[in-house]
UniProtKB/Swiss-Prot annotation:
This is Phosphoribosyl-ATP pyrophosphatase. It catalyses: 1-(5-phospho-beta-D-ribosyl)-ATP + H2O = 1-(5-phospho-beta-D-ribosyl)-5'-AMP + diphosphate + H(+). It comes from Herminiimonas arsenicoxydans. Its main location: cytoplasm. It is an enzyme of class 3 (hydrolase).
Amino acid sequence: MSETLKRLSEVIESRKPANGGDPEKSYVARLFVKGDDAILKKIGEEATELVMAAKDARVSADKSKVLYECADLWFHSMVLLAQFDLTPQDVLDELARREGISGIEEKASRTAD
């Protein structure tokens, strides 16, 4: 796993109130205290901002906002992973598991819940 992702994951984990994160001093700790809905709302906002940045980049040819908004989406997705005691490595492992499998085949192999 990238050292940057590893360090960021560790910082996010340290912001959990159970690990001493203070919601008065830490944005991430505040998200953890507010719970799943607050984190999911933020992910929805960031996903929308990424979509809009990508549309704007097609017109302006300026990709910097796409990068910025994608970083925000990744960050908040990492907060959600931590909320469920998952890590970026878990995502990388899942991607590796899917490697070489067509998307159609992978989707068909899922069991209905």
